[in-house]
């Protein structure tokens, strides 16, 4: 249960749709990126900067970000904590 997650430069994604956040340096991930481009499922949110993370969604879309995977993961954690706080307020009434 995640909300919208900032992946840099004003771009946000639906956190619930992301299944992996990975470092783009390995050869298999470079192939995955190229395959997604050929299939029309590549979303480049780097604004021309170096790709530092690849996000893989449940719809097999590949999202490129210029933000480090650790930073994006931390934003997921912060989002989850915030949602839990909101749910706790609702439960207490």
UniProtKB/Swiss-Prot annotation:
Disulfide bonds: none annotated. Pfam families: RemA-like. Signal peptide: none annotated. Belongs to the RemA family. This is Putative regulatory protein Fnod_1678. It comes from Fervidobacterium nodosum (strain ATCC 35602 / DSM 5306 / Rt17-B1).
């Amino acid at each position: 249960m995640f909300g919208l997650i900032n992946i840099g430069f004003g771009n946000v994604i639906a956190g619930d749709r992301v299944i992996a956040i990975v470092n783009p340096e390995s050869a298999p991930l470079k192939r995955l990126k190229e395959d997604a481009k050929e299939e029309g499922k590549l979303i480049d949110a780097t604004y021309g900067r170096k790709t530092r993370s690849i996000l893989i969604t449940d719809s097999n879309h590949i999202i490129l970000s210029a933000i480090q995977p650790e930073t994006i993961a931390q934003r997921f954690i912060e989002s989850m904590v915030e949602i839990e706080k909101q749910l706790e307020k609702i439960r207490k009434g």
